[in-house]
Amino acid sequence: MQEKVLVLDIDGTLTNSKKEITEATKQGIWNILQHGHKVILASGRPTPGMRKCEEELELKKYGGYLLSFNGARIVECKTGEVIYQRTLPLSIVPGLYEFAKANGCGLITYQGEGVISAFEPDKYVQLEARINGIPIQVVDDFVSYVDFDINKCLMTAPEEIAPELEKQLQEKYSDVASIYRSEPYFIEIMPKDVNKATSLDHMLEGMGLTRENAICCGDGYNDISMIEYAGTGVAMGNAQPAVKEAADYITGTNDEDGLVEVIDKFIMKPEKE
């Protein structure tokens, strides 16, 4: 049996449009875990925002990994240990603050179990906190307050202007950060050269496995790197067009148990042959 590593984005992939993991998806994941394969949840979410999915899938019992902040932190589920971490240079924070202020954007980072916001939360910052089930703390002086290690910042803007702002940020900070949108209104500011693919490569090497063992499934822009990297890259039926173009296979949507199709086709069926 060739060991497989199933790598799953959360929002729009593992969860349906109601932000739920269906029973069929849970059973499929438990089945492959019991057959000796591995599961990694890979998300732009902060680590606390992944805990509910970790608990629902019983990954502390079965084993698994949380690749959070788009790959800037990796946690082993059984031990809770942080096994890999990358941080942003704090020197970038004042410039991000001024840029966000000038363009009317939201700007947040993460501390402990919550979100730290530079301004009164807009609807996109509120959405980020709600999705992750974590509180928002608005601070008076964001630049002075952020004096701790940060895995990422998130800038929020209406989707009509976000692409242009993303481009400007990339031009300004490409030497120190990786910048890309995970949603039409979320601009991720990450440590340079950190994405889901680079962190996954680090993990697989530690496991003694290669990209050929990986089946990566996603729907958003921040999933493209790992979908292109994987031996088998899968786009959900609800994925952005650019994600589908990058994929080897397009499965059903997240409301059609698309992951069950992937598990059957690429893991369980080959095992029987």
What are these model-derived regions, one by one?
Residues E23-K123:
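Active-site phosphate-binding/coordination module
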Residues F99, N103-C217, S225:
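Conserved acidic, metal-coordinating active-site core of Asp-based
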Residues M1-L8, Q27-W30, Q34, E171:
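Non-catalytic pre-domain segments flanking phosphatase-related domains
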Residues I32, S43, N70, C153, ...:
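Residue-level signal for inorganic ion chemistry
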Residues M1-V5, T22, E188-E273:
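Mg2+-dependent phosphoryl-transfer enzymes with acidic/Ser/Thr/Gly-rich catalytic loops
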Residues G36-I40, G64, K152, E212-N213, ...:
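Short active-site oxyanion
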